[in-house]
Amino acid sequence: MLVRSDLDLKLDNTEILNSKIMKELKGTKTEANLQTAFAGESMARNKYTYYASKAKKDGYVQIGKLFEETANNEKEHAKIWFKLLHGGEMPDTATNLLDAAEGENYEWTDMYAGFAVEAREEGFEEIAILFEKVAAIEKMHEERYRKLLANVEGGLVFSRDEDMMWECSNCGHVVIGKKAPEICPVCKHAKSYFMIHATNF
């Protein structure tokens, strides 16, 4: 029996992702199938995570761990289909923030609003209220993503006009200044680990 190495499979996947086929997917049944596969694997991943938690609560730690392992497998399967749908690459963070903001906007302005109306019409008042409450959360998510996008586009993630307390999320070291340091002087982690120190407690 021929056993192929992970490297062989990775090289094969890279060749597929970089092929001309990617440009020809738009509007095809295969594109629709990739979208369905992504949705199915994403849903399975969440479901198995819930099952893992329940199995552990029921006293089945091994079964819980196997559900978690399978959930991680499904996550990776979903990533394959997601990347194929995006030309073989993960979009950049600004693109992802915009996509996330637009998705959250749809959820609170259209999807959950409509779901609440229909639930209320069918006599499910408590479910209608839940839809509305979750819609309010999605609105906050949209606002957060749009603020983060503005920070990325404006170069404000690691730099501000006034002095800030920049905290290393790895070791907790705090630096005061207009910019986060390129490297943490304590743990040597990169600038990407710094964030504005939060005092919301």
Would you name each region that the model predicts?
Residues I21-F201:
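Non-heme di-metal
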Residues L2-V3:
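Short, small-residue-biased leader/transition segments that mark boundaries at the very start
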Residues L7-L9:
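Short hydrophobic targeting helices and cationic amphipathic motifs
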